[in-house]
Curated annotation (Swiss-Prot):
It holds the Pfam family Toxin_cobra-type. Disulfide bonds join 24-42, 35-63, 48-52, 67-78, 79-84. It is found in: Secreted. Keywords: Acetylcholine receptor inhibiting toxin, Disulfide bond, Ion channel impairing toxin, Neurotoxin, Postsynaptic neurotoxin, Secreted, Signal, Toxin. Negative results: does not show binding activity to the acetylcholine receptor of an electric ray eel nor lethal effect on mice. The keyword Secreted applies. GO terms for molecular function: acetylcholine receptor inhibitor activity; ion channel regulator activity; toxin activity. This is Long neurotoxin homolog Pa ID. PROSITE patterns: SNAKE_TOXIN. Coiled coil: none annotated.
Amino acid sequence: MKTLLLTLVVVTIMCLDLGYTLTCYKGRDRSSETCRSEQELCCTKTWCDQWCQDRGPRLEMGCTATCPRRMPGLDFTCCTTDNCNPVPT
């Protein structure tokens, strides 16, 4: 009886969708954020402003549901694994 109960518990756990959540870097300090269930991508957005020559490109990082389309002056990089969006070099 105990074996049957244990088997049922193991099968139940294996069949459940345990709700994997993605984590993405959210800033230059490499802190991570847990993405909402509908956000299945990590994204890094870079662009230049008037101080780009002195300070380097501006940067936004985090979770997203879709990878934005490329636009003039903006660069997007998207990926699908935990913390796969490091600060560009």
